[in-house]
Every structure is written in C-alpha cells, then in structure tokens.
Swiss-Prot record:
InterPro entries: G_TrmE, GTP-bd, GTP-bd_TrmE_N, GTPase_MnmE, P-loop_NTPase, Small_GTP-bd, TrmE/GcvT_dom1. The gene is mnmE. Keywords: Cytoplasm, GTP-binding, Hydrolase, Magnesium, Metal-binding, Nucleotide-binding, Potassium, tRNA processing. Gene3D superfamilies: P-loop containing nucleotide triphosphate hydrolases, Probable tRNA modification gtpase trme, domain 1. Belongs to the TRAFAC class TrmE-Era-EngA-EngB-Septin-like GTPase superfamily. TrmE GTPase family. Homodimer. Heterotetramer of two MnmE and two MnmG subunits. This is tRNA modification GTPase MnmE. PROSITE patterns: G_TRME. GO terms for biological process: tRNA methylation; tRNA wobble uridine modification.
Amino acid sequence: MNTIFSRITPLGNGTLCVIRISGKNVKFLIQKIVKKNIKEKIATFSKLFLDKECVDYAMIIFFKKPNTFTGEDIIEFHIHNNETIVKKIINYLLLNKARFAKAGEFLERRYLNGKISLIECELINNKILYDNENMFQLTKNSEKKIFLCIIKNLKFKINSLIICIEIANFNFSFFFFNDFLFIKYTFKKLLKLLKILIDKITVINYLKKNFTIMILGRRNVGKSTLFNKICAQYDSIVTNIPGTTKNIISKKIKILSKKIKMMDTAGLKIRTKNLIEKIGIIKNINKIYQGNLILYMIDKFNIKNIFFNIPIDFIDKIKLNELIILVNKSDILGKEEGVFKIKNILIILISSKNGTFIKNLKCFINKIVDNKDFSKNNYSDVKILFNKFSFFYKEFSCNYDLVLSKLIDFQKNIFKLTGNFTNKKIINSCFRNFCIGK
C-alpha cells in the first residue's frame, strides 16, 4: 500500500500542527529531513531540513509496526502551525511519492491489517460524531467487548449448526433425535443473541437520529411565543401584528440528553399579496417532510375549522409525522389548561403567554422523543436478518438441504457485520464517513 499522510489538527490559527504519516517508506522520509537517529516510541526534538535549510524545530515520534494504529510504520511531526512551513513539508512528502490520505483511510488500514472489526469502526465513528452521555456509555470499551462477544457467539453457533447438518446430510442413519433437539436449541439461542444485538443497535440508531420539532399554524396564534418559552430564549420576535415571522427560525435544544432542533415557522395562509410571506409559507410546507413532530397551533377551540384556509397538500404531508394540536390563548377563551384526545389526536389547551402548562407539554414531547421505535428504517440489515431467522426457526423442518443453504446465507450476513465477508464497495461506504486524519 502507498505511503499516506494527513494533517490531523484543524486548519486555522493555533500554536501546533500535527502531520501523521503511515506506510512502508516512512523511515526513508525521516532520514532525508532529520539529522538525528529517531528511536521508536520516544519523542525526539530535532531540526527539520529541506534543501539544506532548517525550516523549523519539530517534535518527532516514530511508531514501528505492527504495534501501531494502522499496523504499519507511523511517524508524527509536531511542528509550529505556520502555513508556509506546513506547505513546505507537505510538498516534500508529495515529491517523495507519499499522497494525501482519504477520509477515514487510517482506520481503514487498521481494519485491512486485521487490527479491528467493522463493528468497532462503527462504534468509533459514533463516539466522534454524536456528543452525548448516552452515546458515550454505549460506545465505551466495555460495551464494545459485549458487541464482539455476541458476534463471536453467533459465529460459533452457526458453525456448529452447519457441521451438524452436514453430518446429517452425509449419513442420516446416525443422526438421532437428540441431535435434532440440539439443532432446535441452538436456533433458539441464536434468536436470543440476535435480539440482544438488535436492542443495542436500536438505542445507538435512536441517539444518532436527528429529531426535529416544527411549530405550525395560522398567523398570530402564538407560535413565536411558544417557541421562545420552550427554548428559554427570545430568538423569535413577538408582536400582536399578524405575519411577524417571515422565515423559519431554528434553535437546537437538549431533551433527555438528545439534541432536538426546534423550528418556528411563518403563519400558514393560502391568499396573501405579500411575496415574502408567500415564499415563507412555501418553505414551511416543504420543510414538513423534515419534521418528526408537528405542534399545530390554533387559537379558537373549533375542531371543525382546525385546518381551514390552509394549502391543500398540507394534510397529506402532516400525516407522515407525529402530531399534537395546541389550542392556545386558553386564558382568553376562558378555558382551563388541560389535555384530551379526539380520534387518537392529542389536543392540549395551553396559554403560551402565561407558560404554566409548558412543563406538561415538554413531558409529552419527552415521551415521543424517548420512543426508540420511532424510526422504523434504522438497523435494517440486522432487523431483516432477525425476521428471516425467526421465520426460519418457526418453519424449521427436516429438509436439511434447504436448512443448510439458508444457514450459509445467514453466516455470510453475519460475516458482513464483522467485515470477514465483504467487498470494496462495502468497505468504502463504511470508512468515507470518517473525518480526514482518522
């Protein structure tokens, strides 16, 4: 494999820049620009020479294979963060047949050299991208060991089953009833292991999912007031003039250690002469698909006219989301704040201005946000695997040729999870989600 390098510290002002190099020619690259003898795993302070000119003082660390991150020889240059110096060193590396690393290529080489599994790579990626306490707990080393233990057990049990069934195919007369019971029992254990794996992946995918809450409704019903109360800030302008909000205003907040995107929108109305207002309404309608929860606000307690005078395709789009109808200005209506249901639609009477019922509203939002089954398209590979295997277990028969072919397919799918059975496309799609320098 080619020698690769990357700047692993961010661009911009700073005191330090770190350049990481990995490959078989790293020792050769050092000798040309450093006059000192570089020892393994010892930080060496030395001058860097390019064209017999000292360009900088650097801290150099050399890691010898195979006990390195990538499984290859690695060198790290710790130099001053001066763009001229950095460019000189990068040009030197390019002239000596090294190349820029692709996103995630260091970790990809670690995987290709057999030092890590695909599941571990995914856990590392989640740890970097999603910064919350729950994700940290799920991706720490102890959890990683549980994942690997489950996969190891799955592989062992599948191999045992394949061996048993191949023996049965070879000489059925020596295959006893106890052997049949052993196969059924092993199938049952496999299902349990898959269920544990699915539960863990469900939580991880739930934490990865971006959750968006949109506040929709007609003009001057109190959407901006509610937005400010929930976010505990005053980013939306609040007046008694209809149509104050012309564009979508968004704010990120935290609920149950999960980041939520709150969106305040322009009032919905079909007929308007104001061009800016029309553009705002069209944007609202298009953004509905991006929302997970719709808080639809009205200010008159008249269920028949809830969706009066709004765009025709609005209702079709809103059906795809969770929906809570908020009847605002309960203090003016002379009604008590409260909650009730009509035809499985949750309706809450509130007063955004007083804000006394906002805590209760947050509780209902919490329940929807905390619903880990909310996203039905996550962890599809393992879920399909589980469903197929459940059906296979229920329909289990003595047609051992069929059983064996199904098991071998199942074994391949398990190997795809670990990376033992894969192809170039799968590897590329996995590692290109990482940052440069990882």
